[in-house]
Amino acid sequence: MAIRRLILLSLVALFSASGLFGQDDKGITADQLVAKNIEAKGGASALQGLKTLRLSGKLLVNDGKLELAYLQTKKQPGEVRTDATLQGMTVVQAYDGKEGWKISPFQGRKDPEKLSADDCKSLIEDAEMSGPLVNWKEAGSTVTYVGREDVDGTDAYKLKVVRKNGDVNFVYLDPDHYLEIRTVSQRTEQGAQIETETDLGDYEKIAGVFIPFAVESGARHSPDKQKIVIEKAEPNVEVDDAMFRFPAPAAKK
């Protein structure tokens, strides 16, 4: 009898841990799901220990017909720079925690240009090393669990994040592993509502933290999406803050 009871308790623990126990979602809270997400990513200590991250790989656009070399560097608490290179020309987007800028050579603009506050919104989100759920209270956001939703056949947990500026992120967590499999960002830019959908997968553990190595994003419900394939991740590399800042004008001769 004791052995049968032990087996039963073990099965209950297994199903609970895998997310298969209690499918009616009774009692599930946003705080519980956020805690599960943090644990799944590697834990608060590992997340805090990831101070910088350099990701390199390829950016596929136009349904994969164009391939650009991709390089992104992030630094806590909120700096990011992304370089995408094709045929010797490099597109740059960067945010230093206060202001953003870009270089757009494919549009005939080879000099750096500052971005408006609205144009910086996507960069600010991208700069978040661990996503919008970790440290959401400190960021002034609110998080609500809104139920389950199908994500390409997966009955995902859906969380709504309302940021301090009023923009909204929906975060979809895998029910078994509690990692993000999709995010939907709703932002107001230049008076227009922008909705971007991002799918995440192929997670690998880097310095104790699970990082997605496949990211596909674009306008929601649009077939035209870009895909990022990470080939190398370098944690806690030495990073010069100057790379995130708007370049100083070249000295005149």
Residue ranges of model-derived segments:
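Short, solvent-exposed mixed-charge patches
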Residues: K252-K253
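Acidic/charged, solvent-exposed loop-and-adjacent secondary-structure segments enriched in E/D, K/R, S/T
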Residues: W101-G131
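Cleaved targeting-peptide boundary
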Residues: Q23-A30
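N-terminal secretory signal peptides that target proteins for export/translocation
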Residues: M1-I3
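N-terminal mature ectodomain segment of secretory-pathway/periplasmic proteins
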Residues: D31-G108, A139-G147
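Short, conserved active-site entrance elements at the starts or edges of catalytic domains
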Residues: S122-K160, L179-R182
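Bacterial N-terminal signal peptides
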Residues: L8-S18
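Gly/Pro-enriched, hydrophobic low-complexity segments
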Residues: G22, M89, D152-A248
